[in-house]
A protein has these predicted regions:
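Alpha-helical DNA-contacting segments of helix-turn-helix folds
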Residues: 65, 71-79
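C-terminal peripheral helix-coil segments that are non-catalytic and often amphipathic
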Residues: 1-12, 100-111, 141-142, 146-154, ...
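Short secondary-structure transition hinges
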Residues: 106-145, 179
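Hydrophobic alpha-helical connector segments
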Residues: 74, 85-114, 167
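Short hydrophobic/aromatic patch on the recognition helix
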Residues: 54-65
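Short, charged helix-capping/linker segments at alpha-helix termini
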Residues: 43-44, 157-161
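Solvent-exposed, amphipathic alpha-helical segments
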Residues: 28, 32-39, 82-90, 169-180
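Basic, helix-initiating cap at the start of DNA-binding domains
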Residues: 1-40, 44-53, 70
């Protein structure tokens, strides 16, 4: 009985070590991929170079990330999670909250750098985007569903409007603007105002 417990404990410890190594390898690959994309751009980023920088063979990259696109998907999910954490329970009317979202997305660009940020946004309009990556499943989209839902409760947005659809429209338009390099404060403010006007109850 004691030997069985000892064997079980040893197996558990070995599994924990393997998992820790797996996560460490994945993190190295992720960082190496971001560095490669930053330096060469997404299209030119080379998986063999990424694997070499992480100290693993090429096949190991695909074990952790089925495609290069999956790296950008993870970058975006991480940034979106950070943004909604920073926004918290954002207060204010619909226009002010959407304006805050825009500012936080711009901060994400400064953190990531132009190359990674634009390639990340460009993925939304690419035929190579993994089919499982639906915008409505993103943390930021879910956050916007809640924001728009509150606006519906307050009578600012029609109750029969689809909050998920409206949130997707907002993010898709914003990403399209930013992916072209549009960062003019007045332009982005007009974009928010136009979107809100389109959402509001007539």
């Amino acid at each position: 009985m004691a030997s069985a417990r000892a064997a079980s404990s040893a197996n558990s410890a070995a599994a924990s070590v393997r998992e820790a190594r797996r996560l460490e390898t994945r993190a190295r690959l992720f960082d190496a991929a971001l560095s490669e994309i930053s330096q060469r751009g997404f299209a030119a980023a080379d998986v063999s170079a990424i694997a070499a920088a992480a100290g693993v063979v090429r096949g190991t990259f695909y074990f952790h990330f089925p495609t290069k696109e999956h790296v950008l998907i993870e970058v975006e999910r991480n940034e979106e999670t950070r943004i909604i954490s920073e926004l918290g329970d954002a207060k204010g009317d619909l226009a002010s909250v959407l304006a805050q979202v825009v500012q936080h997305v711009l901060r994400a660009e400064r953190r990531l750098g132009d190359a990674v940020f634009r390639d990340m946004l460009g993925l939304h309009f690419s035929s190579t985007r993994p089919v499982e990556d639906e915008l409505t499943q993103h943390p930021l989209a879910q956050f916007l569903v809640g924001v728009i839902g509150r606006a519906q409760d307050e009578g600012q947005v029609p109750a029969d409007a689809d909050a998920a659809e409206l949130g997707t429209f907002f993010l898709t338009g914003l990403f399209a603007l930013l992916s072209t390099g549009a960062h003019d404060e007045a332009l982005l403010s007009r974009y928010v105002a136009t979107i809100v006007k389109g959402m509001e109850r007539r």
